[in-house]
A protein has these predicted regions:
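Short alpha-helical
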Residues: 11, 124, 203
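Broad structural signal for hydrophobic residues in well-ordered alpha-helices, predominantly aliphatic
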Residues: 19-20, 100, 129, 208
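Gly/Ser/Thr-enriched, mixed-charge loops and adjacent short helices
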Residues: 41-169
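N-terminal small/polar loop signature for handling phosphorylated ligands or for N-terminal nucleophile
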Residues: 1-41, 132, 136-188
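Small/polar loops that bind or transfer phosphate-bearing groups
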Residues: 8, 120, 197
Length: 209
């Protein structure tokens, strides 16, 4: 059988990508609607290198998908799978937080006196910032499978509450938001003005390259 390492709970897509590399998996599967409404639920596939599965590999997967929905598939009893040591539960969120702590100077961020606000949009990022930067002001950081009726895409029209929070508090230096599976980011400045991804990439290149 296929050996499976399964996350203990919901996790973000970057956590699965890191897990694929850390555990030397051949494939990573993320069940998610990504930044879309929950009715779009599907799955993302990650290659052994942690990034999106390459096109030729995706073609192989697509060819194995039937043209019509069918329930005529072989089912394996979960307990039997465990007894045969084919299934192991792992804490991908803990692994991800440990990786972040080892690769970023979080103490320097905490001591910088920068006030951050974060909106995970009810998505898979609800715990990680809370664990890494506990003083961050957060909204929409509880489980809501329907995302409160708003597609969890971090663009300005979906983030009005974060923008208004920054404008009203007047002491927030930066606002961050992530989508449903926490692999897309939105950014606000201290005035509550949205910075699109194109300008965000330019800022990252300017300071990191």
């Amino acid at each position: 059988g296929i050996k499976v390492k399964l996350a203990k709970g919901f996790v973000s897509t970057p956590m699965v990508s890191l897990g694929v590399v850390n555990y030397k998996a051949n494939l990573g599967i993320v069940i998610t609607a990504s930044h879309n409404p929950p009715s779009y639920n599907g799955y993302k596939l990650k290659g052994s290198f942690g990034g999106p599965l390459l096109p030729d590999e995706i073609d192989k997967v697509e060819k194995r998908i039937p043209d019509t929905n069918t329930l005529d598939i072989d089912k394996i009893n979960l307990e039997d799978y465990k007894k045969n040591h084919l299934l192991k539960y792992i804490d991908l969120e803990k692994d991800y937080c440990k990786h972040a702590m080892n690769n970023f100077n979080l103490d320097k961020i905490k001591s910088s006196k920068i006030n951050l606000a974060y909106d995970p949009m009810f998505g898979a990022g609800i715990n990680v910032v809370k664990n890494l930067l506990p003083d961050t002001i957060q909204i929409h950081n509880e489980i809501n499978p329907g995302f409160n009726g708003t597609p969890p895409e971090p663009i300005h029209r979906n983030l009005k509450e974060l923008s208004e929070l920054i404008k009203s508090r007047k002491n927030i230096d930066c606002g961050l938001a992530t989508d449903g599976d926490a692999d897309r980011i939105g950014l606000y400045n201290s005035k509550g003005e949205f910075i699109d991804s194109h300008h965000l990439i330019l800022l990252l290149i300017h300071y990191l390259v």
